[in-house]
Amino acid sequence: MPNYLLRLAFVGTNFYGWQVQPNLRTVQGEIQKALSQILCEDVKVTGCCRTDSGVHALDYIANFKTQKDFPEEKLLKALNGILPKDVGVYAVKKVSEEFNARYSVKGKVYLYKIWNSEVRNPFLYPFSWQVKREINTEVLRNILKKFEGTHDFRALTKLEEERNTVINLEEVSLNVEYPLIEIRLKASHFLRYMVRRIVGTAVKISLGLYSEEVLEELLQGKGNSPYTAPPQGLHLEKVLL
């Protein structure tokens, strides 16, 4: 049975995340609807991860199997002709039958954008967290570096099921082109809300609203994250295969 990989991007503003939910607009739902229309059969799409409502993706991996052997370029053109304007597929590739978007991924890179100004930027507002108080970026950089390495991130996620919460956060970097602040995080996988809670906690500590003792407890898997950064600043930037 032919197995196809999709690479796509989407603006998450008007979506209730990736995963299909009854009576709600989701990215998975839109893609399955488009593929079913093109292929004239029910299609189930597997995504590389969940995304929360309002979160964006610059690079998202999905796959699906079909009864039909469809030319890649023809399928790419057909998909982009049907999908809504806030979703774009930029690559379609036939892969081995064993490929699974959820389990074949080797890592992910997330980007979080902060607009650090009292004046709203209307072009970045849907894609960033506006923080009006001035952030000391050197303090923020030092705090973020403490998240690097292997830690128990239990206190920085929402535990919906029993799973391993010890993760090696390979890289956390900060890029400042003031007032735009960009935070990148790389790991083999992430827990739900993990990136948003790392960013939210680091920003609140750098603003002096929480002590660094809170951070030490969180990195030992104790307590609960004091703040979750809003979803619109979060972008899945790269999926590593």
From Swiss-Prot:
SUPFAM superfamilies: Pseudouridine synthase (SSF55120). The active site is at residue 52. GO terms for molecular function: pseudouridine synthase activity; RNA binding; tRNA pseudouridine(38-40) synthase activity. Transmembrane segments: none annotated. One of its GO terms (biological process) is tRNA pseudouridine synthesis. Substrate binds at residue 110. Keywords: Isomerase, tRNA processing. It catalyses: uridine(38/39/40) in tRNA = pseudouridine(38/39/40) in tRNA. It is an enzyme of class 5 (isomerase). Disulfide bonds: none annotated. The keyword Manganese does not apply. It comes from the Bacteria. Its EC number is 5.4.99.12. Belongs to the tRNA pseudouridine synthase TruA family. PANTHER family: PSEUDOURIDYLATE SYNTHASE, TRNA PSEUDOURIDINE SYNTHASE-LIKE 1. Homodimer. Formation of pseudouridine at positions 38, 39 and 40 in the anticodon stem and loop of transfer RNAs. HAMAP family: TruA (MF_00171). This is tRNA pseudouridine synthase A. It comes from Aquifex aeolicus (strain VF5). The lineage of its organism: Bacteria, Pseudomonadati, Aquificota, Aquificia, Aquificales.
